[in-house]
Amino acid sequence: MKCIDKLLSLLLVACLGLGLVSCGSESTDQTSYDLETTSYQYGITKVNNISDVSFYGSNLCVTDQDNFGIDQVDSQVAGAGGVFNLATGQCTYGQNLFGKMYPASTTKILTCLVAIEQADLDTQVTVSAHAADQTADSSVANLAEGDAMTLKVLLYGLMLRSGNDAAIAIAETIGGSEEGFAKLMNEKAAALGATHSHFVTPHGLHEDDHYTTVYDMYLIFQAAVQNETFLQIISTPSYDVSYTGADGQAKSQTWVSTNRYLNGKESAPAGFTVVGGKTGTTYEAGYCLVLYSYNDQNQPIISIVYNSDCTLNLYYLMNELLYTFGEAPS
């Protein structure tokens, strides 16, 4: 037993000696990781000068606070909200920023972004029986089985009319199924840092396991508004669409935006120009709105209200948020 103890002691001393050698300055100099050259060499970055590297999150509005500014507005009419100044990189208002929320049809922001990035906008989409089979109270683009149009046209039905039929048709075309497309949605959300979200449908009809947070939706939306096609779609008040029915005959209709700032039913505060956004409503999610606008200093603002108790209060609080927290810093 003593021999074993002695042997272990000798081995321990030897290991410590090796450890001390490995911690010496000469060895460190020879093996140290050079972020600037090694990242370029191994393809981690695409630039060979560290000053040119754009780090993830460097242009994002960042906060670790869940609630701030809620006493300055009528926040009690909603479950969560946030205001983000993209010019200054500041989150100027937060209400339950990181709390789990049901997004309803604001889900379609991610659906639209994934579709734009994953497929050719000229792809022909034919509406399936499953996509066309919606309940009477479902938000639809009034599509029938066999209707055919390009993906780009269908995206207007998704974002303006908030068509659940359009969402399913898009998902089936790109992902093979709703489940396959949801996988793409979750991959994109994770890539954007929206790690407290999980999506199971392309439309946002209630599922217990389909959720996000105000901050995660900000991360998704700020990426989406950098896409010109996405901006073009969400800023359109109404869209006259022509497409082909299952019988080969031409069909047409007009899709009007559900965003009350765009359809003329609500006005933004003086000095603000609304570009567009996405509405959403279910019993569980309440009344939701994700909005992109500019203040009088031409600074882009993202503002979000989730789980409001009615349409009137949804837009009332949104205007309060813009007026109180969307102005340029003095």
Region locations from a protein language model:
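Active-site-adjacent loops and short helices of periplasmic peptidoglycan-processing enzymes
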Residues: 26-215, 224-225
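Bacterial N-terminal signal peptides that target proteins for export
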Residues: 1-11
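Generic alpha-helical structural context detector
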Residues: 156, 160, 168, 172, ...
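Extended amphipathic alpha-helical segments with heptad-repeat/coiled-coil character used for oligomerization
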Residues: 249-250
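Bacterial N-terminal signal peptides
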Residues: 11-19
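Bacterial peptidoglycan biogenesis and beta-lactam-recognition machinery
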Residues: 116-124, 175-198, 214-245, 263-270, ...
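Structured C-terminal helix/loop/strand segments within mature extracytoplasmic catalytic/sensor domains
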Residues: 4-6, 20-78, 86-93, 97-100, ...
